[in-house]
Amino acid sequence: MTSKIFSPKISAVIESLRKLPTIGKKSSQRLALYLLDKSPETAIAIANSLLDATANIKKCVYCQALTEDDVCNICSNTNRDDTKLCIIESMLDMIAIEEAGIYRGKYFVLNGRISPLDGIGPSELKLDILQQIIADRKIDEVILAISPTVEGETTAHFISQMIAKDIKISRIGFGVPFGGELEYLDQQTLLHAFNARTNI
């Protein structure tokens, strides 16, 4: 239907926008038409910034967060607590925790969860890098801030099994409903979740 209404180039923009999370058919059409008709300069600015970012952004060699440098700002910050390592699923979780101001340690971003049905295993989550970081640093606590979904539980269990017994492993959970995503929690709930974390 859209091919009869829109030209091939407009349809291509709409289909590209539909690949973004939470963007459906109607939203992608609205965005495409706004950018092309009402604000072409915004479209060009977005395209240029994305081209520049994709050419220059990489993953931090330590925590796997997106950064322009080999080491991100948090990993290079000497004021952060090197003995605490918080394992999270995505940078959105990092943003939520940082904005809540509840944690001053370092992170490791999994960029996903173990999900055999989706072809995601330990190697896709760079758990070998995580294991090396834990071995190299004097870490006394690993905090698993992983969403309590089925895949999240599997991931948390796998990670807890690969960590040395002399390292404290804790899991946030208070106020985090099963199936809930960490990035959507309000700051007060996150604060309670961190303060009430339980040992594994």
From Swiss-Prot:
SUPFAM superfamilies: Recombination protein RecR. It comes from the Bacteria. One of its GO terms (biological process) is DNA repair. Residues 83-177 form the Toprim domain. Transmembrane segments: none annotated. GO terms for molecular function: DNA binding; zinc ion binding. InterPro entries: DNA_Rcmb_RecR, Rcmb_RecR, Rcmb_RecR_Znf, TOPRIM_dom, TOPRIM_RecR. Keywords: DNA damage, DNA recombination, DNA repair, Metal-binding, Zinc, Zinc-finger. Pfam families: RecR_C, RecR_HhH, RecR_ZnF, Toprim_4. A zinc finger (C4-type) spans 60-75. May play a role in DNA repair. It seems to be involved in an RecBC-independent recombinational process of DNA repair. It may act with RecF and RecO. Belongs to the RecR family. This is Recombination protein RecR. It comes from Francisella tularensis subsp. tularensis (strain WY96-3418).
